[in-house]
Regions:
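A generic secondary-structure signal for well-formed alpha-helical elements
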Residues: 44, 89, 95-97, 114, ...
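Secondary-structure capping and boundary motifs in well-ordered enzyme cores
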Residues: 79, 183, 198-204, 213-216, ...
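His/Asp/Glu-rich mid-to-C-terminal helical/loop segments that flank catalytic regions of hydrolases
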Residues: 245, 251-274
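TRNA-recognition modules of translation machinery and tRNA-sensing kinases, especially anticodon-binding
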Residues: 216, 220-223, 239, 243-254, ...
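Short Lys/Arg-rich cationic patches that frequently serve as NLS/NoLS or arginine-rich RNA/DNA-binding motifs
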Residues: 1-6
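Metal-assisted phosphate- and nucleotidyl-transfer catalytic regions
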Residues: 184-185, 189, 264-370, 396-409, ...
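Hydrophobic alpha-helical scaffolding
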Residues: 29, 148, 152, 177, ...
Length: 453
């Protein structure tokens, strides 16, 4: 007769399994037994009743313990709790009009999964504000704040919707190298790394590899990945590592195909975000305006004249500085009520060598930026697809074709006309939710001074 199998001892931290997140509880579940998992947000004790507020990633749940009807051992556990304890609560759902979502939980079991010190580096409830340096020194605890949870919940949904839109439009997701042998844009704003016996760089952009995938026959590609810029900025709008949402598409007529796809995608995505997160946006005091199509196009030379009329004088064929983008936004907003506009026809001298020049005026390009609420969030263009012109433009910038042979050579073999763009996801999130600092839109910022956490 075979010996009986030993029954493993119960692990107290595994007794209760989550049945619902906080936002899944509703008055229609009256009397239903559920389990929630999360952290103690706060405890409020009155003479005859106590309230335990539990926070999970989806929000808050009020747990109500009437002293006369609650087991003494449960009240004893309640007395042992403190803010940020990790706990599991089992209980019955009860309708309560004054509670969040019209529902509360009457616990019959509380399990302490882990404790936290009485003195915390931050107040996760947000009642006591901390400066941004303290918050990011303690970023993991800072991420427990409801505002941070909502920010990255909305950002996740936004990226997912953008991915789905491109997938439906026939794009394939790709994953390009982040350790590269040459600079994508030229220049010195590169992070150098030692790659065994060779010198290498962290990728500024997936640009070359996006294009090479199209030359390789992929037709339509996109990538969501980090890029690295060794720019010595220390501003509320710059990061040295950020997430770039890139796409590249072949067989285009011109840059308008790229711009039209982006504006249609953003219109659909913003509509979905606004519909899904009405309550969350209200909590964040954020208002999303869905862009009307088509988004206005303003040629750079026209923009310079508009700015001149407003007292901001720029040299002819110069780039538009950040204060110019903000001023143009105010003009567009006042005139049309819209928050997006494209800047087009950028001068050749200030765009990358692979940007297609305008046939009727080679001093201008088929490059563009998208400005949202006064900040550039996208840069893109039609690219040069003819080998001879690509080499010519590269030489004009002082770069050596031999250094870029791996990129240039495939263009000898029938490269299709193509174009694409890159969207800075942190900037898009920042502007969408109305933050003053881009660091609010990235989990663990990498800027001029910060390497940890």
């Amino acid at each position: 007769m075979a010996p009986k199998a030993k029954v493993p001892a119960e692990n107290p931290e595994r007794i209760l399994r989550r049945t619902h997140y906080s936002n899944e509880l509703s008055p229609e579940m009256e009397g239903q037994q559920v389990v929630i998992l999360g952290w103690v947000q706060r405890i409020r004790k009155l003479s005859k009743i106590s309230f335990l507020i539990v926070r999970d990633r989806e929000g808050l749940t009020q747990c109500t313990l009437p002293h006369a009807k609650t087991a003494p051992e449960l009240l004893s556990i309640l007395d042992s709790l403190d803010n940020e304890y990790a706990i599991a609560v089992q209980g019955q759902v009860k309708q309560e009009k004054q509670a969040r979502r019209g529902v509360e939980l009457i616990p019959d079991k509380i399990v302490v999964v882990n404790t936290a010190p009485a003195t915390l580096p931050l107040d996760t409830s947000g009642k006591v504000e901390a400066d941004i340096a303290t918050r990011f020194d303690n970023r993991v605890i800072d991420l427990r704040r409801l505002e941070a949870q909502l920010t990255f919940k909305i950002q996740h949904f936004t990226v997912t919707q953008m991915r789905q839109y491109l997938e439906a439009a026939g794009f394939r997701e790709i994953h390009t190298p982040k350790i590269v042998a040459t600079a994508t844009e030229g220049g010195a704003d590169l992070f150098r790394v030692q790659y065994f016996e060779k010198k290498a760089f962290l990728a500024q952009s997936p640009q070359f590899y996006k294009q090479l995938c199209l030359v390789g026959g992929f037709d339509r590609v996109y990538e969501v990945a980090p890029v690295y810029r060794a720019e010595k900025h220390n501003t509320p709008r710059h990061l040295n590592e950020y997430t770039s949402f890139d796409y590249e598409m072949a067989w285009i007529q011109d840059e308008e195909d790229v711009m039209q796809l982006e504006e249609q995608m953003l219109h659909e995505v913003f509509t979905a975000v606004k519909q899904k997160f009405a309550e969350e946006l209200e909590q964040l005091k954020a208002e999303i305006h869905v862009p009307k199509l088509p988004i206005r196009r303003i040629e750079v030379r026209e923009a310079i004249e508009l700015l001149k009329a407003e007292g901001l004088n720029l040299p002819p064929d110069s780039d538009i500085p950040s204060e110019g983008e903000e001023l143009l936004y105010q003009l567009v907003k006042k005139e049309t009520g819209e928050e997006f506009f494209f800047l087009t026809r950028y001068p050749t001298a200030i765009r990358p060598f692979y940007t297609m020049p305008l046939e009727t005026d080679p001093t201008l390009t088929r490059g563009f930026d998208l400005v949202y609420r006064g900040m550039e969030v996208t840069t893109g263009s039609q690219r040069i697809h003819r080998y001879e012109l690509l080499v010519e433009k590269l030489k004009e910038t002082g770069l050596k074709p031999k250094t870029f042979a791996f990129y240039l050579e495939p263009f000898k073999y029938g490269a299709p006309p193509h174009g694409g763009l890159a969207i800075g996801m942190e900037r898009l999130t920042m502007q969408m939710l109305g933050y003053a600092n881009i660091r609010e839109a990235v989990l663990f910022p990498r800027d001029r001074t910060r390497l940890v956490p």
